[in-house]
Amino acid sequence: MLTYKQRFIQFMVENEVLLFGDFTLKSGRKAPYFINAGKYRTGTQIAALGEYYAECFLAHNVDAKTLIGPAYKGIPLAVATAIALAKNHGVDVGFCFDRKEVKDHGEGGMFVGQKLEAGDKVAIIEDVMTSGKALREVLPKIKQEADVTVSA
């Protein structure tokens, strides 16, 4: 039986998301492979992706009340993971995502979704971690919103 990690890699290859060759990453680093998460384009794909992330979440015993999906690619990942956790594993967590700029009308604020509160444990859901730029951008926003404990 394949592990969730093996099934995830197989899924990425089958969907032409994981590519092999000589690539220059956004960070400027060279790599023998590239993950093009923009190739996930269907409900079936994003549902499967959410399940792989949910399995990883559970395998690593992540203790979080809320999943944060940094704009933009992290948004569907946080939503799909929250759905998979609730539907397939009986684990109900909130989700939210940051805006690129603070909204000063309507509901306002920097985040959409589950409200972050002091003492909350949150997990940041990202598609690919290379340079950590997305984390460096979203962490100050999170800390400004509430004093939370963050896992990535």
Regions found by a protein language model. Give the residues of each.
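PRPP-associated nucleotide enzymes
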Residues: M1-E126, T130-A152
